[in-house]
From Swiss-Prot:
Catalytic activity field: [protein]-peptidylproline (omega=180) = [protein]-peptidylproline (omega=0)
Residues covered by the PPIase FKBP-type domain: 162-247
HAMAP family (alphabetical): Trigger_factor_Tig (MF_00303)
Gene name in the database record: tig
Protein name per UniProt: Trigger factor
Organism in which the protein naturally occurs: Methylobacillus flagellatus (strain ATCC 51484 / DSM 6875 / VKM B-1610 / KT)
Pfam families linked: FKBP_C, Trigger_C, Trigger_N
EC class: isomerase
Disulfide bonds: none
């Protein structure tokens, strides 16, 4: 085997590979001889079919299999020989081949992994959110828990913030229907952010049985992307309007939250402890977002098109799945790949940066860190020990906690390198309630 590599651009390579024919012909003959021992054909006993008939019947198929395997092996060998890291799949083009040629040749065009040069992070500013959980924050959380367990009763007045409504909805873009609720309608609590804010503002002031038609102009950066920059006309019928009736903060409420003896003070302590854990979790999320952005902002990187295209496909599939769950007819939705390229490029860039950094700085999560992450997952379930057992019953299930634990190591590495400053934040801002 011989291979020559041509550099087309920073990442694109063209490799011409020559493979001797004689070993391939020998392999073809060997396979046909083996096949002749077992092949069955009408008019012949098994294994007694003449070799020339077997060759005539199966020769082309066997030759194609041998050639395909030869290309795969030789490409892999040539890549290793030339110390190339292939990104994505190669495009293979076979050169013309005459019967007596001593070699077959093909041209493989592909991209290689880029160099990842992570810059100086010492000037990258990262703000560490600071929030102390006090009585006011606990009270807000208790109010949320009470609202979550509210019962609702019909009212004849117009709808307002906090009411539960059921609506039937049809949405149009340029007079083409893009969304329609089913016969059960759509349940919403006004003001809880279930839809775009401008949409929710139209839901107040309407009585059960009324109808309202209005338009919403979505911004260019709206998610999901198919509504970005579009004006949507909504035809909404208000089926029901119900007001909330909150439960009392008492022993019965405590028991509903799992405090078996109904001790209200114990319930308050558990809520406080849980809230502190959630605040710590939100702070870690904010730090991770900033750490990853610092890496993106300080890394020179050209991303292979193959990686971007693969990520675009994944994002489109994810968006389609999300729309299906919402009852949107995908036949009326055109998800242009260009809508996803910016996010796909960011995702692919970050993946390359993290891979380089983890390998360079040896940041892979160890067994103890993975175990700690599994324990964190398990605490969300009623029987955490069973969840831990489930994860360790199949090592593939540990991939997700291992990846998240490794990301935590990356964040810690960035925080040690960057300029980190503490910043006091409001409870509602941190919890996403504002």
């Amino acid at each position: 085997m011989q291979a020559t590599v041509e550099t087309i651009s920073n990442l694109e390579r063209r490799m011409t590979v020559s493979v001797p024919v004689q070993p391939l012909e020998s392999e073809v003959n060997e396979r046909i001889n083996r096949l002749a021992r077992t092949v069955k054909m009408p008019g012949f006993r098994p294994g007694k079919v003449p070799l020339n008939i077997v060759r005539q019947q199966y020769g082309a198929q066997v030759r194609n299999e041998v050639l395909s395997n030869a290309v795969e092996r030789s490409f892999s060998d040539a890549v290793e020989q030339n110390k190339l890291r292939v990104a994505g799949y190669p495009h293979i083009e076979h050169k013309p081949y005459a019967e007596n040629d001593p070699q077959i040749e093909y041209v493989a065009t592909f991209e290689v992994f880029p160099e990842v040069n992570i810059g100086d992070l010492s000037k990258a500013k990262i703000e560490r959110p600071v929030l102390e959980v006090g009585e006011a924050e606990v009270k807000k959380t208790i109010d949320v828990l009470l609202r979550q367990r509210a019962t609702f009763e019909p009212v004849k007045r117009a709808s307002k913030k906090g009411d539960k409504i059921n609506i039937s909805l049809i949405a149009y873009i340029d007079d083409q229907e893009v969304e329609r609720t089913d016969e059960n309608g759509l349940d919403l609590i006004i003001g809880e952010g279930g839809r775009f804010p401008a949409f929710e503002s139209e839901l107040s002031g309407n009585k059960a049985g009324s109808n309202k038609v209005f338009e919403i102009a979505y911004p260019e950066d709206h998610k999901p992307e198919q509504l970005a920059g579009k004006t949507v006309r909504y035809d909404v019928t208000f089926n029901t309007v119900e007001q909330a009736k909150l439960p009392e903060f008492d022993a019965d409420f405590a028991r509903s939250l799992g405090v078996e003896d109904g001790d209200v003070e114990k319930m308050r302590e558990e809520i406080t402890a849980s809230l502190k854990q959630e605040v710590e979790k939100r702070i870690r999320v904010k730090l991770k977002e900033q750490a990853f952005q610092a890496l993106l902002d300080n890394t020179a990187l050209e991303v292979p098109k193959a990686f971007i295209n693969a990520e675009v496909g994944r994002l489109i599939q994810s968006t389609q799945d999300n729309l299906k769950q919402r009852g949107v007819d995908l036949a009326n939705v055109n998800l242009e790949p260009a809508l996803f390229e910016e996010q796909a490029t960011r995702n692919a860039s970050l993946r390359l940066i993290l891979s380089e950094l983890v390998n360079r700085e040896n940041l892979q999560a160890n067994a103890e860190q993975v175990r700690n992450m599994v324990n964190v997952f398990a605490q969300s379930f009623e029987r955490p020990d069973d969840v831990v057992t489930w994860y360790y019953a199949d090592t593939k299930r540990l991939d997700e906690p291992a990846a998240l634990a490794t990301e935590d190591n990356v964040v810690e590495w960035v925080l040690k390198s960057a300029n980190v400053v503490d910043k006091k934040v409001k409870f509602d801002d941190l919890m996403g309630n504002s």
